[in-house]
């Protein structure tokens, strides 16, 4: 199983970097993990809606260039499907049974994801109706992927 995580922007906070490193190490026993960062574009607070779309479209071009034809693409979206940890584990397990050995999770930048990425998405996943910083979302996603593999393999993991 290959899992790629494409994320807009770099992680700057040390505590988040440490958490990402820890879960990346733990996941190495269950899958081949590849974290891909694409540069975010600076977005001023007072951008018009059309300017926001331009920023999202430019970030989307960078994201799309990293997505392979063989990827099953799961985008993280506020309006996506909200799952329990057990249901996410079942989703990942079912994808492998269906022959999808390359899963790609996509985390957008501060303005969200551009239309071309949303159109390429095979599944929209939401962790909450809350908005999270994309750096923190990367850590939360890694923890949930790790938890999923523990559930799939009937291994203990704290609740």
From Swiss-Prot:
Binding site for S-adenosyl-L-methionine: 76, 108
Record has Nucleotide-binding as a keyword: no
InterPro entries membership: Alpha/beta_knot_MTases, RlmH-like, tRNA_m1G_MTases_N
HAMAP family, sorted: 23SrRNA_methyltr_H
Compartments where found: Cytoplasm
Enzyme Commission number: 2.1.1.177
Gene designation per UniProt: rlmH
Any GO molecular function: rRNA (pseudouridine-N3-)-methyltransferase activity
Record SUPFAM superfamilies: alpha/beta knot
Record's subunit section: Homodimer.
Coiled coil: none
Domain of life: Bacteria
A Pfam short name: SPOUT_MTase
Function: Specifically methylates the pseudouridine at position 1915 (m3Psi1915) in 23S rRNA.
Keywords: Cytoplasm, Methyltransferase, rRNA processing, S-adenosyl-L-methionine, Transferase
Any Gene Ontology CC annotation: cytoplasm
Protein name (record): Ribosomal RNA large subunit methyltransferase H
Reaction it catalyzes: pseudouridine(1915) in 23S rRNA + S-adenosyl-L-methionine = N(3)-methylpseudouridine(1915) in 23S rRNA + S-adenosyl-L-homocysteine + H(+)
Family from the record: Belongs to the RNA methyltransferase RlmH family.
First-listed, main subcellular location of the protein, grouped into a coarse class: cytoplasm
């Amino acid at each position: 199983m290959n899992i790629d995580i494409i994320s807009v922007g770099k992680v700057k906070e040390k505590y988040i970097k440490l958490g990402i490193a820890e879960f990346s190490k733990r996941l190495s026993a269950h899958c081949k993990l590849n974290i891909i960062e694409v540069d975010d574009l600076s977005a001023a607070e007072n951008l018009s809606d059309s300017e926001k779309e331009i920023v999202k479209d430019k970030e989307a071009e960078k994201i799309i260039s990293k997505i392979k034809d063989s990827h099953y693409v799961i985008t993280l979206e506020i309006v996506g499907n909200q799952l329990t940890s057990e249901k996410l584990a079942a989703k990942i397990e079912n994808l492998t049974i269906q022959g999808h050995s390359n899963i790609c999770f996509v985390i957008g930048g501060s303005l969200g994801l551009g239309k071309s990425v949303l159109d390429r998405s095979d599944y929209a996943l939401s962790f909450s109706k809350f908005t999270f910083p994309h750096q923190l979302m990367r850590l939360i996603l890694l923890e949930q992927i790790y938890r999923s593999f523990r559930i799939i393999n009937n291994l203990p993991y704290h609740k």
